[in-house]
Amino acid sequence: MLEDSYLQLARTILEHGTYKDDRTGTGTYSVFGYQMRFDLSQGFPLLTTKKVPFGLIKSELLWFLHGDTNIQYLLQHHNHIWDEWAFKNWVTSADYDGPDMTNFEHRRLDDPDFAPIYQAQMQTFDDQILTDDAFAAKYGNLGDVYGAQWRHWQTRQGKTIDQIANVIEMIKTHPDSRRLIVSAWNPEDVPNMALPPCHTLFQFYVADGKLSCQLYQRSGDVFLGVPFNIASYALLTHLIAKETGLAVGEFVHTLGDAHIYTNHVEQVKTQLTRQPRPAPQLTLSGAHDSIFDYQMSDIKLSGYDPAPAIKAPVAI
């Protein structure tokens, strides 16, 4: 099955992973330098051993491709993946006069009395982002994260580089180039990002009329994050292949620190008891000339019949 390589990664970490402390204070079991390969001609690699919300993957990728760094677009599409990082901008500002949100990242999980207070403040924050453009401009921006680096890389001369447009043009005109690369890791901008890029660099490769993509990911949350990353870059490969007139080849996923958080171990064990199901199929509709013209409704899956979702806390 298409997701076997992902399941083997999870088993490898449980069996051989090294325990490490981490930035979030949660603790992880991790391995270093792991590679998975997915043949995109065999189906779309969205996990079936648990339900993964494809709508969130679509809206986040389109957000990146728009060059957007403000969560307002995500909230308009009911996507809350990045909420906590923007929320922190607000609750640590001089404008915030609500309940104490110090260390909300852990208190929301560990303190049952605090959890509803946090949820109420987060709802207030989301509502204001959606209805107040000035508030959204001030507190909804995450800094120079993926969209900024992909579409508006800042040069020393004060100009910008559109890496996505450039790499698409290079695939069309110089498909054998070894420079079909997009980087999200800009050392100068890392301090100004809500979260430094986890998926840092990707490269395309054209052979036999097929487009393949390899991602280097410095850090991968294997239970929650990596399934999203696999599907997101598979979708990106499909979108660029369609614009460049190519079939899809492989998605190659290379991970630096691949880890399972200690509070995800039982969930991973549950997932590993399940049998993979047939992979869904991706359909891209609409006669779009550019990857930047796609809307949510243009991207559809068929035949997705996953096992039930498995909940787990996000480490912030």
Swiss-Prot record:
* Positions annotated to bind dUMP: 23, 178-179, 218-221, 229, 259-261
Positions annotated to bind (6R)-5,10-methylene-5,6,7,8-tetrahydrofolate: 221, 315
Give the UniProt keywords, A-Z.
Cytoplasm, Methyltransferase, Nucleotide biosynthesis, Transferase
User: What does it catalyze?
Assistant: dUMP + (6R)-5,10-methylene-5,6,7,8-tetrahydrofolate = 7,8-dihydrofolate + dTMP
A GO cellular-component term linked to this record: cytosol
Its Enzyme Commission number(s) read 2.1.1.45
Provide one Gene Ontology biological process annotation. dTTP biosynthetic process
| SUPFAM superfamilies documented for this protein | Thymidylate synthase/dCMP hydroxymethylase
Job description of the protein: Catalyzes the reductive methylation of 2'-deoxyuridine-5'-monophosphate (dUMP) to 2'-deoxythymidine-5'-monophosphate (dTMP) while utilizing 5,10-methylenetetrahydrofolate (mTHF) as the methyl donor and reductant in the reaction, yielding dihydrofolate (DHF) as a by-product. This enzymatic reaction provides an intracellular de novo source of dTMP, an essential precursor for DNA biosynthesis.
The family annotation for this protein states: Belongs to the thymidylate synthase family. Bacterial-type ThyA subfamily.
Task: Provide the protein name.
Answer: Thymidylate synthase
